[in-house]
Every structure is written in C-alpha cells, then in structure tokens.
C-alpha cells in the first residue's frame, strides 16, 4: 500500500482512507493542504465537519482501492 502523504501525491477534493493518531481509519475528503497541515472534510448523514490535522499526526493516507485490497475487503 502506497502512503500518499510521504509522496506528496494528494489531490484536493478527493476522498481517501485516512489513519489519524489514536483513531480508526476513516473516509475523509481532502479540502486543501498547507506545508504543515491537511484540511479534511468529514461528510455524514447530518452534514459535514471541516477540521485540520498536523501532518505529523497523520499515520497514513491511502487510495480507497489500495486500502480495501490490502485489508481483504
């Protein structure tokens, strides 16, 4: 599985599987990226939540297909 965060291949507006520190992996849309942070949108049935994370707090960002294939789903 290719960790996109290490390769600077993140596309704004795209949905990725994201592993954040001390949280289970979840689907998040990347809104934009700064040199130190990534701003995400978490979309749900009752609306959206926009938040930022320091890149050092992100364990990995993966293409959905790669994530599901690697985890046997």
Roles of regions detected by a PLM:
Residues 1-9:
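Mixed-charge, Lys/Arg-rich low-complexity intrinsically disordered regions
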Residues 4, 35-37, 41, 67, ...:
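Residue-level signal for functionally critical sites in structured catalytic/ligand-binding pockets
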Residues 15, 23-51:
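Basic/aromatic-rich interaction segments and small domains that mediate binding to polyanionic partners
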Residues 44-73:
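Intrinsically disordered, low-complexity, charged/polar segments
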């Amino acid at each position: 599985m290719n960790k996109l965060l290490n390769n600077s291949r993140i596309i704004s507006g795209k949905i990725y599987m994201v592993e954040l520190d001390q949280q289970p992996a979840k689907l998040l849309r990347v809104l934009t990226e700064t040199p130190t942070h990534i701003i995400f949108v978490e979309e749900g049935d009752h609306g959206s939540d926009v938040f930022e994370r320091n890149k050092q707090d992100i364990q990995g960002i993966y293409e959905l297909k790669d994530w599901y294939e690697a985890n046997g789903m």
